[in-house]
Amino acid sequence: MTWTDFNEYNSDVQFQIGQRIQKLRIDKKIAAVDLAAVLDIQSNQMSRIENGRANCTVPQLYVISQILGCSVDYLLFGKQCLTISQEQADSIKVL
């Protein structure tokens, strides 16, 4: 992968993460300015994140996931990571 390929890939991923954040935020009827305030960032920075022009930190992604009721996996990859209980894991081992 060349540096140009990496930058294009990174920009695409950054955009997708921002779009997922924006969609969930709108679905939850949370104003961008309110989410920005919780994250202790300016509202224009929140806009840049949602439009794929800025990255979030890992702690910011965690807080966003908690506020929006999703996993960090969903924000990063668009897939919800399923967790299972210890009892379910033990049952699978028996099989």
Where would I find each of the regions flagged by the language model?
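A short, Lys/Arg-rich alpha-helix, primarily the initiator
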Residues: 2-27
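A composition/secondary-structure signal for short, hydrophobic, low-basic-content segments
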Residues: 10-12, 38-41, 56, 84
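Short alpha-helical elements of helix-turn-helix
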Residues: 17-19, 44, 58-61
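Recognition helix of helix-turn-helix/homeodomain-like DNA-binding domains
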Residues: 39-56, 77
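DNA major-groove recognition helix of helix-turn-helix/homeodomain DNA-binding modules
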Residues: 57-74
